[in-house]
């Protein structure tokens, strides 16, 4: 909480069993508090929640870390989802060729229908090699008010790919990837994303991969390097394109486009793997790189 007064927050909770009791949290003024979600819903395996601030201005971050004893199984910050929609796109999902030594052990889509009616859902894969609907994911019935997780099958053999979710009722969706990347156990969360409206993304001299999903025949953006040197990059797109971001790039400037364009950034290093969707509401004011090292977390005051 960055306010001079205390903040009061309602946390609405759901699990695989349906609606759970709402928790009310009080955050002292100008302070940071950490809560374990396992204490909110003990014994639940699939969760979704919605935060409502009754009073005060707060910043919220969610971190998922898996370990058993002294063995770490990875960790990742989870980006917030946009409002529920009948058309959802999840970009920047790691594929089997993300790094040279990639072995994906499981990849699942987590779905939640917040309304009162069940939803019929179709999932399409989008990659640089094309768009297709995998067998078994073309007509899923998801019960309302319950969190559901479905295994992804027949995955594209690309470095990165995206998912398009078409639903009869508004939904939210995320993808959880688990596997070995460069001989390191990792988990990666990929959240849905809204189309860009012309944002600027600042980078900390670290290479990565930019995922671009659009129906436009090509997309252009401006790259800023050392001493403010600018250059324009134009990429042809067949549903999706991937651009390798050099570590010399300080900034990428996007323009609003007639066709909806969706962006995500993926980074790999000796510390691990991380991806993040680029949300317009966040990137106009603050842009943060994915956190690669789950053992280091320094809260920043604003």
What residue ranges belong to the model's regions?
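Short tyrosine-centred short linear motifs in exposed loops/low-complexity segments
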Residues: 6, 43-46, 117, 158-159, ...
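Short acidic, flexible loop segments centered on an aromatic residue
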Residues: 2-20, 52, 103-133, 166, ...
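A cross-kingdom feature marking solvent-exposed beta-strand/loop segments within repeated
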Residues: 8, 14-50, 127-162, 227-251, ...
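Transmembrane beta-barrel architecture of outer membranes
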Residues: 22, 32-36, 46, 72-75, ...
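Long, internal scaffold/assembly segments composed of regular secondary structure
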Residues: 81-151, 164
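Short, aromatic- and glycine-rich surface loops/edge beta-strands on solvent-exposed regions
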Residues: 45-55, 160-169, 249-267
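Conserved functional hotspot residues at active sites or interaction interfaces
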Residues: 2-3, 56-115, 171-217, 236-239, ...
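Short, tandemly repeated low-complexity microdomains enriched for cysteine and small residues
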Residues: 9-13, 20-27, 60-66, 71-73, ...
């Amino acid at each position: 909480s960055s306010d001079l007064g205390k903040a009061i927050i309602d946390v609405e909770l759901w699990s695989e069993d349906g609606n759970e009791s709402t928790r009310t949290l009080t955050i002292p003024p100008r302070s940071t508090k950490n809560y374990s979600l396992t204490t909110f819903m003990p014994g639940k395996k699939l969760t979704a929640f919605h935060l409502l601030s009754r009073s005060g201005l707060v910043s919220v971050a969610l971190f998922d870390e898996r370990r058993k004893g002294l063995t770490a199984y990875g960790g990742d910050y989870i980006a917030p989802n946009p409002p529920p929609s009948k058309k959802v796109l999840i970009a920047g999902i790691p594929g089997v060729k993300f790094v040279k030594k990639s072995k994906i052990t499981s990849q699942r889509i987590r779905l939640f229908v917040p309304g009162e009616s069940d939803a019929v859902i179709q999932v399409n894969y989008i990659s640089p090699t094309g768009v297709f609907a995998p067998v078994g994911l073309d007509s899923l019935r998801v019960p309302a008010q319950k969190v559901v997780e479905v295994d992804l099958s027949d995955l594209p053999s690309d470095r990165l790919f995206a998912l398009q979710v078409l639903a009869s009722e508004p939904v939210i969706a995320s993808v959880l990837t688990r596997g070995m990347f460069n001989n390191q156990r990792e988990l990666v969360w990929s959240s849905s994303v809204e189309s860009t409206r012309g944002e600027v993304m600042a980078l900390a001299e670290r290479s990565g991969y930019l995922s671009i999903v659009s129906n436009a025949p090509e997309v252009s953006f401006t790259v800023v390097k050392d001493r403010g040197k600018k250059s324009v990059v134009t990429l042809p797109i067949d549903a999706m394109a991937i651009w390798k971001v050099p570590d010399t790039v300080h900034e990428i400037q996007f323009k609003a486009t007639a066709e909806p364009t969706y962006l995500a950034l993926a980074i790999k290093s000796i510390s691990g793997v991380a991806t993040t969707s680029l949300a317009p509401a966040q990137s106009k004011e603050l842009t943060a790189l994915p956190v690669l090292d789950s053992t280091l977390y320094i809260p920043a005051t604003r």
